[in-house]
Amino acid sequence: MIVRRQNRRFTIMAAGPRGSGKSSFFNSLIGKEIVTSRGHEGIDLYMLNLDCEGIMQRITLIDTPGFGEGFDDSEIQETICNFIKAQLDMFIAEESKIRRNPKYEDTRVHCLLYFIPSTSSSLKSRDIAFLRKVSGLVNIIPVISKSDGLSITERIEVKRQVMEQIKHYNISIFDLDDPEVYSSPAAGNDLNSLVPFLVVSADRENFESRARNYQWGDVSIDNPDHCDLPALRELLLSTHIYGLIDYTASEIYENYRAAVLEGGVRK
C-alpha cells in the first residue's frame, strides 16, 4: 500500500540527443522560460515552487547534456547514469545514520523523460545503450519530440517501432495505468496507449501563448488533437506526482539498496 505524504520534492530529468527539445519542453511545461540554452556539458538543476492543482509543489527540473552525432558519447551517458545513482547512494547514506538530519531533502530522480527526435524512425543504438543503463534506476517515460513534423501515419509507425524496441531490449518504463500510482480514478485512462508521448513545444517567444507558429498556421501545444503534451503535463504536474515519488521509494530505491547491501554491481 502506498502511503502519501504531501509536498515532497518532485524531480524530473530530461535526457536525449542534442537538439531534441529538452530545454524547450521544460519551458513549455512550466509556461515560461526557466531553462536557458545550454553552453556547456554539465548537468543543470532548476529548483522552483509551482502551483499544481492548488498545491504549491517543490519541483526540480534537471537538464542534461545531449548525445551527439558522429562521436562517442559514452562518457556523457555515464555522467548522467552516475548522477542518478549518486542520489540513491546519498539517500542510503542518510538512512544509515544513527542521527538523521530532520531537514534532509530527497534528491532522488523520480522521472526520466527520454527524448527521441521525430526525425528518427526508431531508437538508435546510443538510445538503447543509455536506456538499458538507467533501466531499473529511474522511472522512464519516453517522449517523441517535435512531433508536429510527422503525419498521422508516421506518428503511429514511430510509436510502434519504439515500443517494439523497448520490449525487445527489456527496457523497463513506468506503468502509467497502475492504479497504485495515480491520484484519481479518472487519471487511469489508458495512458500507456499514448507512450511514447508525442510532444510539441512552444516557440521561445510564445511560452505564455502556448503555440508554435508556422507560415501555414499555428500549432496549439495544449490541443490534444495536435500533440500529447496536455496528457503528459497533467500526469507530471498533477495525477502521477506522488505515484512517481512513491514508486521510486518503494520499488526502485529498495531494489537498488538491496543490491548495494548484497555487494551487487549496478549497470
Curated annotation (Swiss-Prot):
Q: Which GO terms describe its molecular function?
A: GTP binding
Segments carrying the region annotation (G3 motif) are 63-66
Q: Where is the Septin-type G domain?
A: 6-263
Q: Which InterPro entries match?
A: G_SEPTIN_dom (IPR030379), P-loop_NTPase (IPR027417), Septin (IPR016491)
- Residues the record lists as binding GTP: 16-23, 66, 146-154, 212
**Keywords for the protein's UniProt record, in alphabetical order:** Cell cycle, Cell division, GTP-binding, Nucleotide-binding
- The region called G4 motif is annotated at 145-148
An annotated GO BP: cell division
Region entry G1 motif, spans: 16-23
Show the coiled coil region(s). Answer: none
- KW Translocase (keyword) present: no
User: Which SUPFAM superfamilies does the entry mention?
Assistant: P-loop containing nucleoside triphosphate hydrolases (SSF52540)
Q: Name one GO cellular component term.
A: cell cortex
Tagged with keyword Kinase: no
Source organism superkingdom:
Eukaryota
In which family does this protein belong, per the annotation? Answer: Belongs to the TRAFAC class TrmE-Era-EngA-EngB-Septin-like GTPase superfamily. Septin GTPase family.
Q: State what this protein does.
A: Septins are GTPases involved in cytokinesis. The septins localize to the site of cleavage and act as a structural scaffold that recruits different components involved in diverse processes at specific stages during the cell cycle. Septins are also involved in cell morphogenesis, chitin deposition, cell cycle regulation, cell compartmentalization and spore wall formation.
Task: Kindly state the subunit structure of this protein.
Answer: Component of the septin complex.
**Full protein name:** Cell division control protein 11
